Amino acid sequence: MCRAAWALAAALLCACAWADAPCRIAYDLGSSGIRAGSTAVDTVVQADIDYLGPLLAGRGLEETVAPTRAALRELAERGGFPAHCQRVGGGFSAWRLALERDSATLADILARIAAESGVAVLAIPQGIEGAYSHLAARRALGSRFRTSHVLDIGGGSLQIAGERSAWGALLGQKAWQRELCRALRVTDALPCALQPMTREELATARALAAALLGEAGKALPETVSLTAISRPVTRGILPAVARLEGDGAVREGLARSSLATAIDRLAGMTPQEMARLVGGPERFAPYLLSDMLLVEGVLIATGGQTLQVAETDLTNLPGLLADDHAFAWGRRHACYLARLRREGLDAYFGDPADCSE
């Protein structure tokens, strides 16, 4: 993200006291569902909708429109949010992918959603989402957040977010494994049978991670420290490495060398052999090795030797609720959609006051 855009992100989120702010409702539309919150009520409510799956399968977002409209209406009622509040939604990784593929189709979908739900949904740029993530991590972790950046691995996207710099890509848990499945198994199936890997396949996987994550090191400061907050790390990688090392110690961090050793040990095993060795929740097993390779790649790209780990249920809601610019676009949504068709993600950075549409 360029410096000017990041300066805008910082300015947008610098004032987050809502006591005197107008009533707002925000909707965080992620890869696998919607979360909703309001400045008027502490409640956060959610609905599960798979946005990433249809996109990765090449079907687009059309099949998600009806459940999205219904969820946007139902969530406000379930959360007890005041009816007079302004409503804005932020579309993140899956929505950015849809925009990249066909901006006109996405703009039409957003127009229909707004007309039938009263919610103005915007496609939020990666860097702005980074600002949201950093703000949410500071609020959620408090004194436990002692690093310069937060590492947030979702299903679709990966974020490395700091106060003044951020980087992200469509390399979340499922999207990254899809890259591996294509490269090593020539399939789009998710999850795919990555194990056992040969030494040559493991080298290919690491080279792929280096290629896809290499831009992170260029976009971020020379010195970066990371706190991982997502369940693929907190409930998958961290306990697996602890079991492999067998010392029973409670860990709040992870050494890159320990992660590399774990990868080398597990890659050649069958999934069943790995499960017997490391245990852990069954739902994490199909992605454990690919998650490890992803995090190792992040540490290499950012020059990190250690990773702090502190689980929190991070959402984009605090940042979106504080984003005056997004809510200004919500009031000029037709103009925003016209610009979205022409300018793509850059439409967000325009000035709503300049609208003539």
Describe every region a protein language model picked out.
Residues 55-73, 95-147, 162-357:
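Helical "lid/coupling" subdomains associated with nucleotide-phosphate turnover
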Residues 20-43, 137, 141-170:
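Gly/Thr-rich phosphate-binding beta-strand-loop-beta motif of the actin/hexokinase/Hsp70
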Residues 31, 49-52:
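N-terminal extension/subdomain marker
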Residues 14-18:
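N-terminal signal peptide c-region/cleavage motif recognized by signal peptidases
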Residues 1-6:
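Bacterial N-terminal signal peptides that target proteins for export
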